[in-house]
């Protein structure tokens, strides 16, 4: 557990390695596509990947414009930069968010941070989770990425699927 005054105990090297990986891939992409925009990145991650995304956004605000986390538990949200943040939170008693990671409801509102509380389990929010969970998350994610106002963003209805039949593959 991260303790106040002792940030990232036992995890700092993991976060720094994740940050280095992101920067390495960014460098490789710049060589392949030199004219692309690399100063408005959207970082996305589940659990530790969400922590790494938030850690990297904190250290490289000049590169990151959006962060999407799926139940990150250890790294506090970036509040001192104007990032667009969406965070899906699980309702899993086995995976508890460390104190100080989430902003207060007042801070989230003031900084236009969208926090979506779900009824999902932590591990179901990964790419190995049930299709129904992924579809529900995708619907909210699509809305967020469309640059809609955060005040219009609401928790996705997890009881009723939006997409029930995708049809035959391949998918775009």
Task: Identify what each model region corresponds to.
Residues 24-81:
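Primarily recognizes the serine-hydrolase "nucleophile elbow" in alpha/beta-hydrolase
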Residues 1-36:
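Serine-hydrolase catalytic machinery in alpha/beta-hydrolase-like enzymes
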Residues 119-132:
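Catalytic histidine-centered segment of alpha/beta-hydrolase-like enzymes
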Residues 17, 21-24, 51-52, 132, ...:
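Extracytoplasmic/secreted proteins, especially bacterial periplasmic and envelope-associated proteins
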Residues 142-172:
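Alpha/beta-hydrolase-fold serine-hydrolase catalytic core, especially in secreted/extracellular enzymes
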Residues 102-110:
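Short, conserved catalytic or adaptor-binding loops enriched in Gly and charged residues
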Residues 86-89:
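Short beta-strand/loop motif that positions the catalytic acidic residue
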Residues 94-101:
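Conserved alpha/beta-hydrolase "acid-adjacent" motif
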């Amino acid at each position: 557990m991260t303790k106040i005054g002792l940030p990232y105990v036992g995890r700092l090297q993991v976060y720094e390695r994740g940050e280095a990986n992101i920067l390495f891939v960014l460098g490789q992409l710049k060589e392949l596509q030199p004219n692309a925009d690399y100063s408005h990145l959207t970082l996305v991650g589940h659990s530790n990947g969400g922590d790494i995304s938030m850690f990297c956004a904190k250290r490289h605000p000049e590169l990151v414009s959006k962060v999407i986390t799926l139940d990150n538990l250890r790294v506090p949200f970036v509040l001192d930069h104007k990032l667009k943040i969406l965070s899906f939170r699980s309702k899993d008693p086995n995976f508890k968010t460390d104190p100080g990671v989430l902003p207060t409801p007042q801070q989230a509102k003031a900084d236009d941070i969208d926090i979506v509380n779900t009824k999902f389990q932590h591990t179901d929010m990964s790419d190995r989770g049930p299709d129904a969970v992924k579809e529900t998350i995708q619907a909210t994610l699509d809305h967020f990425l469309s640059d809609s106002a955060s005040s219009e963003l609401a928790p996705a209805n997890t009881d009723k699927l939006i997409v029930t039949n995708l049809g035959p593959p391949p998918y775009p």
